[in-house]
């Protein structure tokens, strides 16, 4: 769990510092449109759309942008995006999972493969690394939601599996199938969550040194910079000393 938390935290901080808002909003809008197109355009009747909108709001995406993304799906003029997952190994044999929404599988696959190759890694077949991850729900709250004891008690009552609290906030994990029920129960006690999403949580982590960590961060940065890529997950773990250097 420590490795996953470290990875989450470093990506969280780096994302805050480096993210280009227009690109981030574009990716959030794409998820909203795909979610709205996959079911009812009403978030009350479409759990995926409700989560997509909630996460967009957490990133301060303007209300007009959110409504436009929903209407785009309802209007029938939205591009046909496919959900694809790529799996491979980065520097040091670290497992990497890439989730994308694309209207051109060949383009996206070529771009992702090229990034892995340039980083000294290799793209594998679907399933080549995901067996070493668990698909779980992740619900995050800011520290203002309450102290660690209050959040822990709420998480236990809601049926969550794990809770961690650090300087970035509270992170609650639950079973993939229970995301909706757990997040709803938590909302009744703690208020609206900062984010609610499904993630790939590594079963075990791989320790890496500073050089490998820098290479991995560069690979992940490049992947996240691709317009089609929505999420990137990995299983590397770094020491507190290296973490401090990379976060500086």
From Swiss-Prot:
It comes from the Bacteria. InterPro entries: Integrase-like_N, TACO1_YebC-like_2nd/3rd_dom, TACO1_YebC_N, Transcrip_reg_TACO1-like, Transcrip_reg_TACO1-like_dom3, YebC-like. Keywords: Cytoplasm, DNA-binding, Transcription, Transcription regulation. The keyword Aminoacyl-tRNA synthetase does not apply. It is found in: Cytoplasm. One of its GO terms (cellular component) is cytosol. GO terms for biological process: regulation of DNA-templated transcription. GO terms for molecular function: DNA binding. Belongs to the TACO1 family. HAMAP family: Transcrip_reg_TACO1 (MF_00693). NCBIfam families: PRK00110.1, PRK12378.1, YebC/PmpR family DNA-binding transcriptional regulator. This is Probable transcriptional regulatory protein NGR_c27950. It comes from Sinorhizobium fredii (strain NBRC 101917 / NGR234).
């Amino acid at each position: 769990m420590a490795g996953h938390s470290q990875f989450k935290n470093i990506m969280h901080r780096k994302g805050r510092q480096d993210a280009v808002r227009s690109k981030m909003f574009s990716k959030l809008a794409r998820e909203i449109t795909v979610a709205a197109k996959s079911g009812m355009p009403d978030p009350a009747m479409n759990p995926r759309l409700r989560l997509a909108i909630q996460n967009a709001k957490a990133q301060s995406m303007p209300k007009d942008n959110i409504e436009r993304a929903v209407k785009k799906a309802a209007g029938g003029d939205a591009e046909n995006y496919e959900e694809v997952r790529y799996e491979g190994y980065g520097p040091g044999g670290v497992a990497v999972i890439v989730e994308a929404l694309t209207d051109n599988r060949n383009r996206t696959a070529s771009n992702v493969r090229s990034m892995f190759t340039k980083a000294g890694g290799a793209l594998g077949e679907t399933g080549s690394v995901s067996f070493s991850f668990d698909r779980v729900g992740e619900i995050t709250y800011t520290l203002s939601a309450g102290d660690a004891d209050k959040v822990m008690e709420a998480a236990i009552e809601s049926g969550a599996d794990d809770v961690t609290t650090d300087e970035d906030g509270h992170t609650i994990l639950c079973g993939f199938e229970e995301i909706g029920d757990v997040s709803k129960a938590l909302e009744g006690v703690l208020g609206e969550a900062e984010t609610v999403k499904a993630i790939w949580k590594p079963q075990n982590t791989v320790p890496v040194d500073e050089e490998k960590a820098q290479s991995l961060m560069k690979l992940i940065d490049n992947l996240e910079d691709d317009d089609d890529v929505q999420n990137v997950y990995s299983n590397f773990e770094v020491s507190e000393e290296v973490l401090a250097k990379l976060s500086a």
